[in-house]
């Protein structure tokens, strides 16, 4: 086909996303605000690795915590294997990511006295409570909510 004859713009074509875990569903839900999305998964839609994650999501949410403390904890716990700029990026963006999940209905365990009303835990290597969780099945809770939202979105085909 002659490229000059192609009148279809890339913006009018659906975006194909491979994978139905946290990353794939997040991208799909955001892109579906303005275009059609197709999600493909090699196994069943409920069989992503996201659903198996138990612990929680780390974030700088408490005013007593800081990005610098989070980065320091991550680098120290990483025994020389952590790229500091990557750890810093994650620490800087973590609160926004957790806010997005909360805004999308993820049922994190709550604590009225906790930062943003969330119950935070402290796990190995962390100097502050900074792990938001949904009981002991955080990944499952996140995956179920985002998958249900994707199934309900008319711009997303699964």
Feature map (PLM): residue ranges:
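Conserved N-terminal/central alpha/beta ligand/cofactor-binding core
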Residues: 4-6, 41-158
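A generic local structural motif
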Residues: 1-5, 24
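N-terminal Rossmann-like FAD-binding beta1-loop-alpha1 element of flavoenzymes
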Residues: 14-39
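Short helix-loop-beta connector
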Residues: 9-12
């Amino acid at each position: 086909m002659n490229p000059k004859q192609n009148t279809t713009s890339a913006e009018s074509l659906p975006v194909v996303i491979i994978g139905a875990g946290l990353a794939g569903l997040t991208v799909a839900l955001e892109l579906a605000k303005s275009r059609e999305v197709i999600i493909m998964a090699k196994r069943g839609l409920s069989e992503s690795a996201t659903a198996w994650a138990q612990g929680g999501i780390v974030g700088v949410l408490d005013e007593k915590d800081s990005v610098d403390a989070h980065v320091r904890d991550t680098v120290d716990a990483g025994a020389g294997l952590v790229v500091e700029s990557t750890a810093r990026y994650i620490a800087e963006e973590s609160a926004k990511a957790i806010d997005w999940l909360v805004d999308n209905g993820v049922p994190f365990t709550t604590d009225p006295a906790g930062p943003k009303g969330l119950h935070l835990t402290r796990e190995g290597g962390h100097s502050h409570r900074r792990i938001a969780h949904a009981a002991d099945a955080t990944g499952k809770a996140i995956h179920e909510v985002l998958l249900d939202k994707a199934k309900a979105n008319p711009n997303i085909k699964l």
